[in-house]
């Protein structure tokens, strides 16, 4: 199974880059080597990543595996579907007040 591994190390100059490319090319099963960012080496293929890390540590003291994943990783959806927020229906805060008979009431008042 093809997988993609990203290696990262501290000091990355032209000479170190050439040595790293040479070491990685010697591994059987390596299909793609990509050096776009400074200090990061992206290798795709079917190989033992731990042995490759050990060989790269001979070139540079600090080498770390940053990411490991399958070759054809699906692109992440940058605009996720937003769920509509449910409407909040508010009830009455207090029970309704009953009107008491007063001066202007229609009820009969006995005097």
From Swiss-Prot:
Belongs to the HIPP family. The modification Cysteine methyl ester is found at residue 108. GO terms for molecular function: metal ion binding. This is Heavy metal-associated isoprenylated plant protein 10. Residues 1-68 form the HMA domain. Residues 68-111 are annotated as: Disordered. Signal peptide: none annotated. The keyword Lipoprotein applies.
């Amino acid at each position: 199974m093809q997988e993609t591994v990203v290696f990262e190390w501290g000091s990355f100059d032209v000479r170190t880059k050439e040595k790293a490319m040479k070491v990685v090319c010697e591994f059987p099963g390596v299909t793609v080597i990509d050096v776009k960012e400074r200090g990061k080496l992206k290798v795709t293929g079917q190989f033992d990543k731990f042995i490759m890390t050990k060989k790269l540590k001979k070139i540079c003291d600090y080498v770390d595996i940053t990411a490991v994943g399958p070759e054809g990783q699906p692109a992440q959806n940058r605009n996720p579907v937003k769920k509509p927020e449910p409407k909040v229906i508010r009830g009455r805060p207090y029970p309704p007040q009953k009107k008491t008979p007063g001066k202007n009431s229609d009820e009969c008042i006995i005097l």
